[in-house]
C-alpha cells in the first residue's frame, strides 16, 4: 500500500482574512488510520479535498504513492457523511456502479460488489433498495462501494456524524474491522473527540484561523480493539478518559485564544 502525503500545503479562499490551511504537512503511512480532529473552520475538510483531488493547494504538494495528486482517482475512494446512494438501484448495483463506469465486466463487478457487501456485514441485503435500509446500513453500502474499487486509500468525511450514538459505535467497530482486513490507508475527519481517539493510529488536532496542526498523538486504542478489547471497555478505560479530557481542554483553550484575538 502507498502513503498519502501533504507537504507544507496552504489554501486561501477568496474573501477570507485567514488561510484555510497554512503550511500543513501530514503523512498517512501505508495501512495507517489517520484522523484529523477539530472544530468547524479548522481546515480538515479542505485537507481531505486536497487528498481526494477535488481541489488543489495554493502552495505545497499532495502525493499518493509518491505521485502528485492531479484530480480524483479510483485509487482514493471517498465516503461522505451523506450516503449519496442512487435510489433506483439496489444495494448491490449501487456498490457496483463505480465499477460499471470504469468498464469492469458485469460478472466481475457483481462478484466484487457482493464481496464488498459481505465485508460490511450486508451479504443478504444486496437486493434491497436504499429506502429499505436504515441509516447505518446506507453508510455500510457507501463503505462497500469504496471497498469494491480496491482503493489504496479511503477518505472519510465525518462518515458517522448523522448517526445515533449506538449505530455510530457499531460503525466505528465495523470500520476498524474493514481497515484491518483491507490493509488500506484511511484518512478520516471528525469533530468528535471520542471517535478520533478510538479509531486513530495517528491523531492530528487542528485549529482554525489559520488552519494548522497543533498537536499529534498516536493513540493505542484501535490496536487494542484489534487485540480483542471491546469498544465499551476501551472507552471506559482511565487512559482513554484522561486523553479525552486533555484533548477537550486543548480545544477549549483554542476557543479562548480565538475569543481574545
Swiss-Prot record:
Its EC number is 7.6.2.7. Residues 4-233 form the ABC transporter domain. InterPro entries: AAA+_ATPase, ABC_transporter-like_ATP-bd, ABC_transporter-like_CS, ABC_transporter_ATP-bind, P-loop_NTPase. Pfam families: ABC_tran. It is a peripheral membrane protein. It catalyses: taurine(out) + ATP + H2O = taurine(in) + ADP + phosphate + H(+). One of its GO terms (molecular function) is ATP hydrolysis activity. ATP binds at residues 38-45. The keyword Membrane applies. GO terms for cellular component: plasma membrane. It is found in: Cell inner membrane. Keywords: ATP-binding, Cell inner membrane, Cell membrane, Membrane, Nucleotide-binding, Translocase, Transport. Part of the ABC transporter complex TauABC involved in taurine import. Responsible for energy coupling to the transport system. Belongs to the ABC transporter superfamily. Taurine importer (TC 3.A.1.17.1) family. The complex is composed of two ATP-binding proteins (TauB), two transmembrane proteins (TauC) and a solute-binding protein (TauA). NCBIfam families: PRK11248.1 (NF008421). PANTHER family: TAURINE IMPORT ATP-BINDING PROTEIN TAUB, TAURINE IMPORT ATP-BINDING PROTEIN-RELATED. This is Taurine import ATP-binding protein TauB.
Amino acid at each position: 500500500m502507498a502513503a498519502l502525503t501533504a507537504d507544507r500545503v496552504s489554501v486561501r479562499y477568496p474573501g477570507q482574512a485567514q488561510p484555510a490551511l497554512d503550511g500543513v504537512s501530514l503523512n498517512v503511512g501505508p495501512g495507517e488510520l489517520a484522523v484529523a480532529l477539530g472544530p468547524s473552520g479548522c481546515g480538515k475538510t479542505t485537507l481531505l479535498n486536497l487528498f481526494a483531488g477535488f481541489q488543489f493547494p495554493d502552495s505545497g504538494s499532495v502525493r499518493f504513492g509518491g505521485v502528485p495528486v492531479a484530480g480524483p482517482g479510483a485509487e482514493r475512494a471517498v465516503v461522505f457523511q451523506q450516503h449519496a446512494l442512487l435510489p433506483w438501484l439496489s444495494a448491490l448495483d449501487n456498490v457496483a456502479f463505480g465499477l460499471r463506469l470504469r468498464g469492469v465486466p458485469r460478472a466481475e463487478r457483481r462478484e466484487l460488489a457482493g464481496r464488498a457487501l459481505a465485508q460490511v456485514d450486508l451479504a443478504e441485503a444486496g437486493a434491497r433498495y436504499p429506502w429499505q435500509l436504515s441509516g447505518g446500513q446506507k453508510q455500510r453500502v457507501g463503505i462497500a462501494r469504496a471497498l469494491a474499487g480496491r482503493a489504496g486509500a479511503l477518505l472519510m468525511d465525518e462518515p458517522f456524524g448523522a448517526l445515533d450514538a449506538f449505530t455510530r459505535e457499531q460503525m466505528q467497530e465495523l470500520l476498524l474491522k474493514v481497515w484491518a482486513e483491507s490493509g488500506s490507508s484511511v484518512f478520516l475527519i471528525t469533530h468528535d473527540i471520542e471517535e478520533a481517539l478510538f479509531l486513530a493510529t495517528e491523531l492530528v488536532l487542528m485549529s482554525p484561523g489559520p488552519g494548522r496542526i497543533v498537536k499529534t498523538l498516536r493513540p493505542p486504542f484501535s490496536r487494542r480493539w484489534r487485540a480483542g478489547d471491546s469498544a465499551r471497555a476501551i472507552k471506559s478505560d482511565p487512559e482513554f478518559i484522561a486523553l479525552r479530557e486533555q484533548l477537550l481542554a486543548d480545544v477549549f483553550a483554542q476557543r479562548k485564544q480565538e475569543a481574545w484575538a
